[in-house]
């Protein structure tokens, strides 16, 4: 399955919630009817079955983190293999992706931009260049921007936006040095309450 390259707003409207796929503290302003389905007048949303609700939740989370279907299923398998709550494990694995950490630290305005920075070799982990977006960051790892990328206007713009967002407690960021420390794996309570991971577990448990 190819990565979606169409309008980001369309995806958010399809899920009925802001997926934060566009840059900005709130990517979708009040003029955009996010609860309205895609289309000129917004097609009426059919009442979903239990399976449909579970599928929509999976698609929502997959799109938030920019992960393809096969990757997402593999994350679920790994989450189920680990000790503890499978749903929480899944979200922690997704949060530990390098592209997500770069975004959370404020070095990219969106996860897509952060992913591009990683693939363009603009990001280092513990002083070494890492160009794999799915690389799992470990506690106490230092994530930084390469010297030649620090002057990019998009990085400065992203850091300015990040100042307006709530700062994750599991990260420590030095904006001046353009580096940060992944202090710990986030707890479920640290993450968005708008995600119902139990629906995803139910979907894959069938």
From Swiss-Prot:
Annotated signal sequence range: none
CDD domains assigned: S4
Domain S4 RNA-binding residues, every copy: 96-156
A GO cellular-component term linked to this record: small ribosomal subunit
BP GO annotations: ribosomal small subunit biogenesis; translation
A Pfam family matched in the record: Ribosomal_S4
This protein's UniProt keywords: Ribonucleoprotein, Ribosomal protein, RNA-binding, rRNA-binding
GO molecular-function term, one example from the UniProt record: rRNA binding
InterPro entries in the record: Ribosomal_uS4, Ribosomal_uS4_bac-type, Ribosomal_uS4_CS, Ribosomal_uS4_N, S4_RNA-bd, S4_RNA-bd_sf
Family named by the database record: Belongs to the universal ribosomal protein uS4 family.
Physiological role: One of the primary rRNA binding proteins, it binds directly to 16S rRNA where it nucleates assembly of the body of the 30S subunit. With S5 and S12 plays an important role in translational accuracy.
Subunit structure: Part of the 30S ribosomal subunit. Contacts protein S5. The interaction surface between S4 and S5 is involved in control of translational fidelity.
PANTHER family: 30S 40S RIBOSOMAL PROTEIN, SMALL RIBOSOMAL SUBUNIT PROTEIN US4M
Protein name, UniProt field: Small ribosomal subunit protein uS4
Naturally occurring in which organism (per UniProt): Pectobacterium atrosepticum (strain SCRI 1043 / ATCC BAA-672)
Source lineage: Bacteria, Pseudomonadati, Pseudomonadota, Gammaproteobacteria, Enterobacterales
């Amino acid at each position: 399955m190819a990565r979606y390259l169409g309008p980001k707003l369309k995806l958010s409207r399809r899920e009925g919630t802001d997926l934060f796929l566009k840059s900005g503290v709130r990517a979708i302003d009040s003029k955009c009817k996010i609860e309205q389905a895609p289309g000129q007048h917004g097609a009426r949303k059919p009442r979903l079955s239990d399976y449909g609700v579970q599928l929509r939740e999976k698609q929502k989370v997959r799109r938030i983190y920019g992960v393809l279907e096969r990757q997402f299923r593999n994350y679920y398998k790994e989450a189920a293999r680990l000790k503890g709550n499978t749903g929480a494990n899944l979200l922690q694995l997704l949060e530990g992706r390098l592209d997500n950490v770069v975004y959370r630290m404020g070095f990219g305005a969106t996860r897509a931009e952060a992913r591009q920075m990683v693939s363009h070799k603009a990001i280092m982990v513990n002083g070494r260049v890492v160009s794999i977006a799915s690389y799992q960051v470990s506690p106490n790892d230092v994530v930084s921007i390469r010297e030649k990328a620090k002057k990019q206007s998009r990085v400065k713009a992203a850091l300015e936006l990040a100042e307006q967002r709530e700062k994750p407690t599991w990260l420590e960021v030095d904006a001046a040095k353009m580096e940060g420390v992944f202090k710990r794996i986030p707890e479920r309570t640290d993450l968005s309450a708008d995600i119902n991971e139990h629906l995803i577990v139910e979907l894959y448990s069938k």
